[in-house]
């Protein structure tokens, strides 16, 4: 089992461990520095350990904000992924988990934000207490600094009557801190699985609040509320000696009044690079959005599925890639990902879109999928296309044996792959490295098989004619049927062709027994590297991951299953 786990999860584990180690190092190093640094001794007299907690979490926040944009810069990720010299094997698969890393970094931002906010609430209260009438000793002396001419202050709360809320709303750091906190709350709460599934538009729009978050983060330190003793003051004012003689600061030449200043803002130094990279991403997206997209064909399929054929100048794709589509007449800001269902050999590119939210429902309606189709293609709404981008499914041809598994509309990326196989068979081209493809499709609605069955029938016929019938083994599972369909299936069971798909391979009813399927595949290919590719729900993904671990051999010469899941 350890060897099997290493095959699929080792790189992810190393990346997560490295990220965690850097966070821990930055936190501890910064915490110790602020807890011991002489220039912040007087600051610690007022604030105590909350100073170190606030500053340590701030550095970790800067680090994670530096990382958060990189995984979602899809042109950058696609560029790195396409550079095979720099990105091979498990590292290539790690790039396909970019959204998981994005979420991991987001959790880091959330945790450090809570620490930072709580620590600064303590700091504000300690500053306020420093101005209390019963404050005495060194605390009182430090809080009163700044009242006399040529004195710099240490305590930003200048009077006892300045409340915590007032202080927050009177400073740059306070206002930007509130903006950052509110932005994080909105982004985090709208990123839950429930919101993304039920209202993708809400998730999309709230995520763009990050613009205000990064602007506020860049100027957050401009208030310079946390102040330390200046280097010049430290040379003249010996803290070790003078802290016990604060009553003599005004008179004694050996203990002049300490001078303080705030540190320069540093968050922008951490985030400038990724922000510039993401700005380039937006510019590329804007440029692509203004390139003409010609819609050549529109097909309305059963089960509320819309098929669009399009053309775009200099558009080049590979099997298994995906694009982002924008429809300005529906929303000028929203971009939605869809896998390509066409093959590189075709003179167009296509997508199949299922109605599963407000935006997709509006798109189907705009293209007449509900029965009111525009009579002319020129009357169709304008679309903008960004991409294509590489995903995990593009690696199907990199394994000698590939297992492709889809549920429902998740079959769309495999349409491109199987079409590409079909074209290669038609042209009598070889498939270098690929000797066997197992295809599984699990669907609850028999009507959904309509558009895909034609492709499988063509592939089945062509492979038989080319003597390559052994290359593809497909298994279609129907999980939902009514009484009428059951009777119809029973009456035609003995026919040579399947009653639902029209294929020679009969449709299975129910769900696959994955233990038996993986056991048989492992038996058929005892010493092979097998790529398992999945597009579908999270629950089944966990099951398939488990199967890959269970049936991978601990012997380096045995069978090994490598799991790949499509993520947008």
From Swiss-Prot:
Q: Which GO terms describe its biological process?
A: defense response; detection of gravity; otolith development; response to gravity; superoxide anion generation; temperature homeostasis
Q: How is its activity regulated?
A: Activated by the ototoxic drug cisplatin. Activated by NOXO1. Cooperatively activated by NCF1 and NCF2 or NOXA1 in a phorbol 12-myristate 13-acetate (PMA)-dependent manner. Inhibited by diphenyleneiodonium chloride.
> Residues on the Extracellular side?
34-49, 125-167, 223-395
The residues that carry sugar chains are 238
Q: Which residues form the FAD-binding FR-type domain?
A: 285-395
Q: What residues does the Ferric oxidoreductase domain cover?
A: 55-284
Q: How is it modified after translation?
A: N-glycosylated in a CYBA/p22phox-dependent manner.
Q: List localization entries.
A: Cell membrane
Q: Which residues lie on this side of the membrane: Cytoplasmic?
A: 1-12, 71-103, 189-201, 417-568
Could you tell me the membrane topology recorded for this protein? Multi-pass membrane protein
Bilayer-crossing regions: 13-33, 50-70, 104-124, 168-188, 202-222, 396-416
Q: Which UniProt keywords are listed?
A: Cell membrane, Glycoprotein, Heme, Iron, Membrane, Metal-binding, Oxidoreductase, Transmembrane, Transmembrane helix
Is this entry keyworded Hydrolase? no
Q: Name one GO cellular component term.
A: NADPH oxidase complex
Q: Name one GO molecular function term.
A: superoxide-generating NAD(P)H oxidase activity
What is this enzyme's catalytic activity, as reactions?
NADPH + 2 O2 = 2 superoxide + NADP(+) + H(+)
Task: Tell me the SUPFAM superfamilies matching this sequence.
Answer: Ferredoxin reductase-like, C-terminal NADP-linked domain, Riboflavin synthase domain-like
Which Pfam families does UniProt cross-reference here? FAD_binding_8, Ferric_reduct, NAD_binding_6
**InterPro entries (UniProt xref):** Cyt_b245_heavy_chain, FAD-bd_8, FAD-bd_FR_type, Fe3_Rdtase_TM_dom, Fe_red_NAD-bd_6, FNR_nucleotide-bd, RBOH/FRE, Riboflavin_synthase-like_b-brl
Q: Which cofactor does it need?
A: heme
Recorded hits in CDD domains, A to Z, give: NOX_Duox_like_FAD_NADP (cd06186)
- Which tissue types show expression of this protein? Expressed in the inner ear by the spiral glanglia and the organ of Corti.
Oligomer and partners: Forms a heterodimer with CYBA/p22phox which is essential for its activity and cell membrane localization.
- What protein name does the entry list? NADPH oxidase 3
